[in-house]
Amino acid sequence: MFDGIPSKDALNLKEAHWQRLSTSVYENKPLKKTQDIAKALKEINADIIMLCEVGGLESLNNFNLLFMDEAYSPCLIEGNSERNIDVGFLIRKGLPFYFDLQSNKHRLINYLYPHERESLTHGYPVKGGKITTSHKFSRDVVELKLFKTDRDKPFMIILLTHLKSRLDPERIDPNGFERRQAELRTLIEIYQELEKTHPQVPVMVAGDFNGNASITGTDEEFKDLYTLTSLRDVLEVAQLEAEQRATFYQVRNSSRADGRQIDFVFIPPLLHPYLKPASAYVHRYKDEFGMAHDIPRNMDAKLSLPSDHYPLVFEIEKLPLK
């Protein structure tokens, strides 16, 4: 966040001066990392960029202004995050369709923590003295509808989310499992409602799932994806080799890094014919010489990357815009 509209002169500042421009309680993302993210996104050259952990609409506007040549329309609704990390989009200007964004941040997820359930069972007030019937999404599930003329007649819908992390500082839900499972089930409910309302419209589900939601070795909290929907991971549909799907690396001792896919785009059968062959991949960040960075095998290497998540890229082609 800046005091006023920033100028591109800010891009020439040293890091300490760059940080002083922020008027927020949160630091700016380091200038070099922000520039490297923009470099990667320009190389990918996507029409629609789906983003997690965005520091609000102002941050997204500034990123588009300073780093992306104002080529996109920033699109974000502030969610429920207590850490100021939202989900949002950058949508290329001049595309032959319109878009509409809706939030589900007020939707209940039909979940209380174990101690809250016990308190209500015995008639005690829950934390803070509030009578709580259910929590909401940790962040949000936003609905992006793409349409030609009538917003009620979209030709494609994208659901973007960032499910509950594995952090459990209050020690009330180990690894965030129950909350994440409840959020996933409510996400599926939203998906099914849209399927019913728009039966011939493909609905895509994307975001940071904070766990293994792939069809192989599926974490328990995500199994409903495969029993209740026909959604499939776009990398699975593209038949990308398993070792090429990692979007996050957990650095271990002894210079060992475990690659995991925790970021996903799930597409319905309606979209399978429109997935461009060989277009789906996980983008690897590059150095100043244009060479892909090695897998990070220690924390220094990991922290030097623009982000600890890698972009997932794919192309939908020849989809009727009706």
Functional labels for PLM-detected ranges:
Residues 1-69, 75-87, 130-132, 297-300, ...:
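N-terminal, active-site-proximal structural segment of metallo-dependent hydrolase catalytic domains
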Residues 103-111, 163-166, 280-290:
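Short, solvent-exposed aromatic-acidic interface loops
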Residues 48, 53-161:
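Structured beta-strand-rich core segments of catalytic domains in phosphoester-bond hydrolases
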Residues 58-61, 83-85, 167-170, 212-218:
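Extracytoplasmic/secreted cell-surface and envelope-processing proteins
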Residues 158-179:
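Active-site His/acidic residue clusters
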Residues 33, 37, 56-59, 86, ...:
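Stable alpha-helical elements in mature extracytoplasmic
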Residues 189-204, 210-322:
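Metal-dependent phosphoester-hydrolase catalytic domains
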Residues 55, 162-164, 209-212:
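Catalytic metal-binding/acid-base residues of hydrolase active sites
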